[in-house]
Design a protein with these regions (language model features):
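WD40/WD-repeat beta-propeller blade-loop signature
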Residues: 36, 46, 55, 88, ...
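Conserved strand-to-loop turn within each blade of WD40 beta-propeller repeats
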Residues: 62-65, 114-118, 157-160, 198-202, ...
Length: 368
């Protein structure tokens, strides 16, 4: 028996008995050791958005200070900073001169896309942080960006109520989609030629079938739907400013499950208001999701059997406005982008909060 054949057979045996990465993701999550949570600081103003590289080695974050930082996950070191510029220097500054409020990284880790309040989309080479292209065309702040998985097709959403499709390889605009009746507050996509959006105060979630030039309209939340994330190709999670978190199927026009006041309430007795849900995240192709607000906690949830309901797992102490949440591809850690203010405004200021990134290690129950 040749060594290579022996290795192949051994690998087959291991595959038969070892858990797949997918099965590992479905093991029950345990609350993290708080002492192992790290805070990375570098932005002068609140962190507004973040992405994790597909290999889980790096985090890119952006801020109201208009800067973008590339971090090393293991060491916490700042590897590169793309400085923000002053308003009015757009013609000569390489980078953003307005609050950066959304970003996406291609599934092969080659391209980073960032969008700002000044209607601009910037494309960067993720490895070097070299500026490649600038996309113009939106007539309002760019509020959502997502690369279609397995491609370099980029979807963008804006407060101008439109979605645009771009081909980054060709540095080209493809088409514009219309339908929302209010500003679009969030966008996500998977591997299919479609994207999902949250429509703010038009109270709708929409699934856009790009090739068919059609859209599905879903109704559920009573207030502004502010964030949305794919769980898998069939399900998604949303958060709203009425404090609710909802679980959806692309096959049903109403939520499968809604948790009201998911982060509790605040205010004087009789005048309590729910904490807004400012960020949601999903561990891709698993049953684990997370939500963030400004109640000093990130809440983790398990999607119940058949994705019919949301079960609270545990909360993680995180001080400040949780403006962005992302699970690593492996499911081994969660990153929260936080700030003293909400990413889109200055309604409140939490002076005791730090502007930065919380790296939260995730542990799972060991198999028997």
């Amino acid at each position: 028996c040749s060594p290579s054949l022996h290795r192949k057979r051994r690998a087959n045996v291991e595959e038969e008995f070892d858990e797949t990465p997918q099965e590992k993701k479905l093991r029950l999550l345990l609350p993290p050791d708080v002492s192992e949570i790290r805070l990375l600081r570098g932005h002068k103003l609140p962190v507004t958005c973040l992405v994790i590289s597909p290999d889980d080695q790096h985090v890119f974050s952006a801020s109201k200070d208009c800067s973008i930082i590339k971090w090393d996950v293991v060491s916490g070191e700042r590897l590169h900073t793309i400085a923000g510029g002053r308003k009015g220097t757009e013609d000569r500054h390489v980078g953003h001169t307005a609050h950066v409020i959304c970003m996406s990284i291609s599934s092969d880790g080659i391209y980073l896309a960032t969008g700002d309040m000044n209607k601009l989309i910037m494309i960067w080479e993720a490895a070097t942080c070299k500026h490649l292209y600038k996309f113009t065309g939106h007539r309002g702040p760019v509020s959502g960006l997502s690369f279609r998985r397995g491609t370099h097709d980029l979807y963008s959403a804006s407060h101008d109520r439109s979605i645009k499709v771009w081909n980054v390889d060709e540095n080209a605009y493809v088409e514009t989609l219309f339908g929302h009746q209010d500003v679009i507050t969030g966008l996500d996509s998977g591997s299919r030629e479609r994207c999902v959006t949250a429509g703010g105060r038009d109270h709708t979630v929409r699934v856009w079938k790009i090739a068919e030039e059609s859209q599905l309209v879903f109704h559920g939340h009573e207030c502004s739907i502010d964030c949305i994330q794919h769980i898998n190709e069939e399900h998604m999670i949303t958060g709203a400013d009425d404090g609710s978190v909802s679980l959806w199927s692309v096959n049903k026009k109403k939520p499968l499950s809604t948790v009201k006041a998911a982060h509790g309430r605040h205010g004087d007795s009789g005048l309590e208001q729910p904490y807004w849900v400012a960020a949601v995240a999903a561990l891709q192709n698993s049953d684990t999701v997370a939500s963030g607000s400004h109640n000093s906690k990130v809440q983790l949830w398990k999607c119940g059997q058949g994705f019919r309901h949301l079960e609270p797992l545990f909360s993680i102490p995180v001080n400040g406005f949780v403006n962005s949440l992302k699970f690593s591809s492996s499911g081994k850690f969660l990153v929260a982008g936080v700030g003293q203010e909400h990413r889109l405004g200055r309604w409140w200021r939490l002076k005791e909060a730090k502007n930065g990134l919380y790296i939260i290690p995730l542990k799972r129950q060991q198999p028997d």
